[in-house]
A protein has these predicted regions:
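N-terminal binding-site loop/beta-alpha segment at the start of enzyme catalytic domains
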Residues: 1-59, 113, 182, 263-264
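Active-site mouth loops of central-metabolism enzymes
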Residues: 5-16, 64-73, 103-104
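Short, acidic/polar
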Residues: 13-26, 71-86, 107-109, 136-137, ...
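Residues at the N-termini of beta-strands
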Residues: 32, 90-93, 125, 150
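Short, well-ordered amphipathic alpha-helices
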Residues: 43-50, 79-83, 114, 136-140
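A short, structured active-site edge motif that brings together acidic residues
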Residues: 56-69, 90-99, 154-155
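CE4/NodB-like, metal-dependent polysaccharide N-deacetylase domain
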Residues: 75-96, 116-120, 142
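Beta/alpha (TIM)-barrel catalytic core signal, keyed to glycine-rich beta->alpha loops juxtaposed to Asp/Glu
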Residues: 99-266
Length: 266
């Protein structure tokens, strides 16, 4: 199954709010759910997958392996546990959530386990998240060209991550933009508001449309039905080349996700 360009992000959502969010999203037409081991919500995602009328084969499911599961012999059992919680026998995409902090576990150790997970049928595609260009190059050296299908990374008009984006595009690595609305910071950007006014859409929809126009997948997180519907409607927003260029001027390196164990960013 090809990854749908619009997905449901589940970061910081748990329990009943998450169940309601996912069921509403599926009813609206979303067919892509993004979760992670560290989110501690795979069981809720699994409950929805088990009870929805939407067939599992119609839903693109991603989870991410946490850094505590990288050591030799740990990654595959951790993914099997994720599958049990998710109540499914396969993932569409399994990602390395972050590079091993301070390279405590050699990259080859966890990437080779991820490849094995794919060969065992636990996941259909594999990829990484939050990797720098140097780390992506190292990963390609370890696994060979074409092995890494995907990179998930923070991208929005205020943090455009151009070096990483360009490298991924050169290598044929698909990109998912997380935090595509920069925790709502894009909503008050005058350029986005002005473009939105012209198209009769919101600044948030313009931000999403800008990412989508570059061939990226986006996974905004929202618990409100009207916001979920508006995000989906961004798929229909068509920006001119002039508008795309205007939005490109908003770059200011405003990173939202920068934990102390993050790599040295490009």
């Amino acid at each position: 199954m090809k990854m749908p360009a619009m997905g449901l992000g589940t970061f910081r959502l748990k329990g009943e709010p998450l169940l309601a969010t996912l069921n509403t999203g599926l009813a609206l037409g979303y067919r892509h759910i993004d979760t992670a081991q560290i989110y501690d919500n795979e069981s809720e995602v699994g409950e929805v997958l088990a009870t929805t009328s939407v067939p599992r084969s119609d839903i693109y499911l991603t989870t991410k392996v946490w850094t505590s599961e990288f050591a030799e012999g740990k990654l595959i059992p951790s993914l099997k546990t994720s599958l049990e919680k998710l109540r499914t026998d396969y993932l569409d995409l399994a990602l390395i959530h972050w590079p091993s902090p301070n390279d405590e576990v050699p990259m080859a150790v966890y990437l080779e386990q991820l490849v094995e997970a794919k060969s065992l049928g636990l996941t259909r595609e594999i990829g990484v998240s939050n990797f720098t260009v140097t780390q992506l190059k190292d990963a390609i050296d370890i696994l060979g060209p074409g092995a890494i299908a995907h990179q998930q990374v923070e991208i929005h008009p205020l943090l455009q991550n151009r070096k990483v984006v360009e490298f991924c595009q050169e290598q044929g690595i698909a990109i998912t933009a997380y935090m595509p609305l920069a925790y709502g910071k894009v909503l008050s950007e005058p350029i986005l508001m002005e473009i939105g006014k012209y198209h009769k859409v919101s600044a948030a929809q313009v931000s999403l449309a800008w990412l989508l126009a570059q061939g990226m997948t986006v996974i905004p997180s929202s618990t409100k039905r009207e916001h979920q519907a508006a995000n989906l409607a961004a798929l229909e927003v068509s920006l001119s080349s002039e508008e795309m260029a205007q939005i490109a001027t908003l770059e200011r390196g405003e990173r939202c996700a920068d934990p102390d164990f993050a790599p040295v960013w490009d």
